[in-house]
Amino acid sequence: MSTGIRHARWDDIPRERVTDDISRRLFTGERMMIAHVYLDKGAIVPTHQHENEQLTYILEGSLRFWIGDPAQGVEELVVNAGEVLYIPSNVPHKAEALEDTFDLDVFSPPRQDWLNGTDSYFHDKK
């Protein structure tokens, strides 16, 4: 009987290089996904939005976020180690690593663009 339960060690999950200064490991269920994300100091995650709800938990380092639509006003905030951020579905956001950073991102539903390699916004440094 298959229950769909899966188990893995993070160190056994391949680390995918996204850009020169960002890499990640992914673990996915049917309706959620968790990712270890590694950002070098100065790394930029360009402005983007997605249908997925997002939780970002900073394990080490810190990220500066710009959240919201520039036409309606953008909120800037810094999320440090030990802090967590919730980003609702379809809210534009951008991030910059203020130091070498290791974070845990949770998405629901899973980020199909991350799974199928169509996350081209990473290469647009705006």
Tell me what each language-model feature is:
Residues 1-31, 35, 120-126:
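A short, N-terminal "cap"/entry segment at the start of jelly-roll beta-barrel domains
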Residues 25-26, 37-38, 45-50, 67, ...:
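Short histidine-centered beta-strand/loop micro-motifs
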Residues 33, 55, 62-64, 92, ...:
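Structural motif
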Residues 38-40, 50-65:
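Short, conserved beta-strand element in jelly-roll/cupin
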Residues 44-46, 64, 84-94:
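Histidine-centered metal-chelating micro-motifs
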Residues 59-60, 80-81, 99:
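A cytosolic small-molecule/anion-sensing beta-strand core signal
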Residues 70-89:
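Short acidic-glycine-tyrosine-enriched beta hairpin
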Residues 89-113:
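Ligand-binding loop in jelly-roll beta-barrel domains
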